[in-house]
């Protein structure tokens, strides 16, 4: 997918390049599916059929019914709809929210806003390896708890949470408590089956993490909680009244194609990415003889994300140095630009490790040459930068 072999893009947790086939499908839909899908004449019916097809493609990757999927503009909007909608719908009988201490800002900040509106918020910090203690979280759930929210895969470390166990434990304590899962970094990276995750009430996904464009996402809402979710917007009937406004058909078509393509070769792609991750880990072990490098991602993290600290060079300095060599990585969440990693701080990482953390995130288009270019850049950078 990359046109320039000298460019090494390793920040796929921030965004992915749009697949040319998906871009082509969007362009075709812009010209072909131009009608308003809510109208009744033939071109509109055909446009509506394109929406239906895409909804089905996405539903098959999540193990849910198509009718339980709602299109949004992005993962952040999906998270806001779920978190605020579920909490506000339950405020007449409860006011407690339990959330992990490493959520994405699009979950963390709406929940803090709910705190300002009278909700009690309890944050559960992870263990040192980034995993949540399910028993510790469940112990905070009581009859007053209206919402529990946890991301499936952490965007900074790749740590994978046991969503099935967590959601089951929550419902065992309070069956009325809603469970929201931010699956933006998990979708099409790990298998998701909402028939097995039967205690998850809402789940968010995003297009630009899976080679579709920015500006499109989706939210799963289990039918059993749909009528108890307060929609923040008022308007037309689109998306069953939850998200009014004429649907962005071309981008929805692109999201559907991304789902179909991503699900088709998930196993092979994961094997390829695991090999890249292993190559990088081996290279970092060798570089650890040159600098006090430590890994922040646990061994069982998803292979797409590897977070480590040099413990000697500021993150921003190293990112700029590597960028000069056309190697692109990050220091953490793109939505917290310039801020120290709240995930690493929640894990109890030392201040130096937080300030020198780097995140590498792969996609199926990355190559061993990308990893070697990064390792060469790290080796040279450690020589040149650690005494600045």
Predicted feature locations:
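Pyridoxal 5′-phosphate
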Residues: 1-388
